[in-house]
Amino acid sequence: MTVLGAARLGWLAWSCRRPVLVLVLVVMLLPLVMAAMVVEAQREKPGRLVVPTPHATLTQPFGCTALEIEPWSDACSSHHFHSGIDLAGAIDSPVYAACSGTVLVSRQRGGYGLYMVVTRDPRLSTLYGHLDLPLVRTGDQVVDGQLIALMGSSGNSTGPHLHFEVRIAGLPVDPLPLLSGTLQRG
């Protein structure tokens, strides 16, 4: 066998193993990269946010949950993840903007029901779900503490409450440490 023939065989052996190696690297490294992104997002503090419904009761925290109504997640042993907090209150209770920004979306959609998203900047956004009545429209500028909606029970909801999310760089983070007030716990 010539040196060129041996080199070709070596390349062929490597090229057959390369997809397997790439797959193994992706499977091993992707969870580490995602975990690093979540840690980085949690580390970044957007500043104190206004409690969006000051007289509501916290009924479901952020994170892994056994509630099957929540989206599936392989990251949780319970296989379900709640990407925000639920604040229960009376129907048509006021909902205030947690931060100043632009209303990116205000519409009806699936599990969130009637919802809106306010973006403070390209990295920070807040989501308000299960609304009864939005009081601002897509494109409107809002200031923190401004009345923006009335609480409802639209979408995939078990009763009147606000589903509140904070996303940093597109990733959900626990809103509780970022809120400037205290909440009643149910």
Regions found by a protein language model. Name each.
Residues 63, 92, 133-136, 156, ...:
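Disulfide-stabilized cysteine-rich extracellular repeat microdomains
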Residues 60, 89, 105, 130-133, ...:
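A residue-level detector for short acidic-glycine micro-motifs
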Residues 1-46, 186:
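N-terminal secretion targeting segments of exported proteins
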Residues 90-92, 123, 131, 146:
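A generic structural motif
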